[in-house]
């Protein structure tokens, strides 16, 4: 008995399980990085030019969230309440620390003004513990550009997923 494209059912099942193994391995690696870095998003892609020349659009950033004592000049990734896209900017001022919660003011290197306009409506600073996803500890230039292309061209995502599915089904062991 032959299945999809002349494959035996056992071969087809093996291919599907192989594909599931690849996906689950990637997921486990992501979760492992999240635990080690103490960050919900241990890797992010720069989506705009607001941090040029330090980081270009498409750079892949690695985050670390273990040290809660963020200094002025440090580059952090933060989430704004009510928005789902993380922002990568430099800390330009800090308030508090010690017994009082650490509050931060950020600004993009390529921006004229600080980020108070980007923060949530009732927010004039970031709370380190609640808003900051992590501090940038390393990067790989332009590797994340694939992510930008896929988000700006949704049809490319479907084509890539289709090609990956076809490759898994047609691959012979």
From Swiss-Prot:
UniProt lists the gene as: SEC11
NCBIfam families, alphabetized: sigpep_I_arch
Q: State the PROSITE patterns in the record.
A: SPASE_I_1
Taxonomically, the superkingdom here is: Eukaryota
GO terms (BP aspect) = protein targeting to ER; signal peptide processing
Q: What is its main location?
A: endoplasmic reticulum
How does this protein assemble? Component of the signal peptidase complex (SPC) composed of a catalytic subunit SEC11 and three accessory subunits SPC1, SPC2 and SPC3. The complex induces a local thinning of the ER membrane which is used to measure the length of the signal peptide (SP) h-region of protein substrates. This ensures the selectivity of the complex towards h-regions shorter than 18-20 amino acids. SPC associates with the translocon complex.
Question: Kinase: is it a keyword of this entry?
Answer: no
Q: Which family does it belong to?
A: Belongs to the peptidase S26B family.
CC annotations in GO:
signal peptidase complex
Q: Where is the active site?
A: 50 (charge relay system), 89 (charge relay system), 115 (charge relay system)
Organism expressing this protein natively: Leptosphaeria maculans (strain JN3 / isolate v23.1.3 / race Av1-4-5-6-7-8) (Blackleg fungus)
Extract the InterPro entries matched here: LexA/Signal_pep-like_sf, Pept_S26A_signal_pept_1_Ser-AS, Peptidase_S26B
Q: Which UniProt keywords apply?
A: Endoplasmic reticulum, Hydrolase, Membrane, Protease, Signal-anchor, Transmembrane, Transmembrane helix
Known role = Catalytic component of the signal peptidase complex (SPC) which catalyzes the cleavage of N-terminal signal sequences from nascent proteins as they are translocated into the lumen of the endoplasmic reticulum. Specifically cleaves N-terminal signal peptides that contain a hydrophobic alpha-helix (h-region) shorter than 18-20 amino acids.
Q: What is its EC number?
A: 3.4.21.89
Query: What is this protein called in UniProt?
Result: Signal peptidase complex catalytic subunit SEC11
């Amino acid at each position: 008995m032959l299945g999809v494209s002349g494959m035996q059912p056992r071969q087809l099942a093996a291919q599907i399980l192989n594909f599931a193994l690849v996906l689950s391995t990637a997921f486990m690696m992501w979760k492992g990085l999240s635990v080690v870095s103490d960050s919900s998003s241990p890797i992010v892609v720069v989506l705009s030019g607001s941090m040029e020349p330090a980081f270009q659009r498409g750079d892949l950033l690695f985050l670390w969230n273990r040290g809660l004592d963020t200094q002025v000049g440090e580059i952090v990734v933060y989430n704004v309440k009510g928005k789902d896209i993380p922002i990568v900017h430099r800390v330009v001022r800090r308030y508090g620390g010690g017994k009082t919660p650490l509050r931060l003011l950020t600004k993009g290197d390529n921006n004229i003004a600080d980020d108070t306009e980007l923060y949530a409506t009732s927010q004039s600073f970031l709370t380190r513990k609640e808003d900051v996803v992590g501090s940038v500890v390393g990067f790989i230039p332009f590797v994340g550009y694939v992510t930008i292309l896929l988000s700006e061209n949704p049809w490319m995502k479907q084509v890539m997923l289709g090609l990956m599915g076809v490759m898994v089904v047609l691959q012979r062991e």
